């Protein structure tokens, strides 16, 4: 069954050594799948320069509800 998760991601800018926090909404079957989905999204966004960061860290995955 699919579930809705909030995934908090910390973005790091290596040039200014600052960080910021974003929250992504993800539909997945479990926490591991949610983590994998966000990791793939972040890698692609960094590669295509869509994300305003040099690196990231997934810091929290929060289950919201079953769909």
Predicted regions span which residues?
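Short, mixed-charge low-complexity intrinsically disordered segments
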Residues: 40-67
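Short beta-strand element of the conserved SAM-dependent methyltransferase core
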Residues: 5-11, 26, 55, 60-64
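A short, exposed loop/beta-hairpin motif centered on an aromatic-Gly-Thr core
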Residues: 18-31
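Compositionally biased, intrinsically disordered low-complexity regions
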Residues: 13-15, 32, 52, 67
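Short aromatic-glycine-(Arg/Gly/Cys) micro-motifs in beta-strand/loop hairpins
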Residues: 1-19
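Sparse, context-dependent recognition of short Cys/His-centered cofactor- or disulfide-binding micro-motifs
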Residues: 11-13, 27, 41-46
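A short, structured loop/turn motif at beta-sheet edges
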Residues: 1-2, 28-34
